[in-house]
Regions:
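Catalytic-core regions of core metabolic enzymes
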Residues: 1-241
């Protein structure tokens, strides 16, 4: 089509082109199947932008991915769903983030929120501080890569000197990552948690942003970050400073 090759399925496309990454924009009803098609094709990485995939669909595809890996099959990393993607400035962008706000540098950014990722990156760039890689994890309750996974990658990355880790209410991921950082992280981390004023039981934007217990609150997560040696800000306008 207009000089662009079209293939019947992901496996055929990967075989013909050598592609190793799939980015999924498929509507929610078919997105989990699209993720699994990429996993079956043994791609290295799947990035799912789609928001609103049924939880049951994501549970099923996650179960199949784990079963495949347990049986000795190739492991495929999943970023998302409901994420903006990933960017290494001046090298590669896979997703929907505005590329012009990024500047190549040595600060990593990881966040559950796409817009807060953009805000942190824009602040850094305005201050003349570049980014090594910015990763949007996505805000759905069932997802792939988590904060702890990306923090481990940044810790091992020779091109990253410091990290901004942004989270939000709901779930244990940020606290687990902070505790891992206390034991293993060799680089300074700035932390921010959105949702300080969020009432319990009310979803705030993302499907996964829901306080279901005391440890899920922004205050509790910020306290854990401080205990683990993070430089914490309570104001999103100060994430880059």
């Amino acid at each position: 089509f207009e000089g662009i090759p079209i293939y019947a399925n992901v496996g055929e496309a990967a075989q013909a082109t050598g592609a190793t990454v799939s980015v999924v924009y498929v509507p929610p009803v078919g997105a989990a199947a699209a993720i699994w098609e990429a996993v079956e094709a043994d791609l290295d990485f799947v990035i799912c932008i789609t928001e609103g995939i049924p939880i049951r669909d994501m549970l099923e595809v996650r179960s199949k991915m784990r079963a495949k890996e347990a049986a000795g099959g190739k492991k495929t990393l999943l970023l998302g769903p409901n994420c903006p993607g990933i960017i290494t400035p001046d090298e590669i962008k896979i997703g929907i983030m505005p590329g012009h706000i990024h500047k190549k540098g040595r600060v990593g950014v990881v966040s559950r929120s796409g817009t807060l990722t953009y805000e942190a990156v824009a602040q850094l760039t305005e201050l003349g501080i570049g980014q090594s890689t910015a990763v949007g994890l996505g805000g759905d309750p069932i997802n792939g890569l988590k904060h702890i996974d990306v923090m481990q990658m940044f810790n091992d990355d020779p091109d990253t000197d410091a990290v901004i880790m942004i989270g939000e209410i709901g779930g244990p991921d940020e606290a687990e990552a902070a505790r891992w950082c206390k034991a293993h992280m060799q680089k300074p981390v700035v932390g921010f948690i959105a949702g300080v004023t969020a009432p319990p039981g009310k979803r705030m934007g993302h499907a996964g942003a829901l306080i279901s217990g005391g440890a899920d609150t922004a205050e509790a997560k910020l306290a854990v970050m401080e205990e683990c040696g993070f430089t914490v800000t309570h104001n999103p306008s100060e994430m880059g400073r």
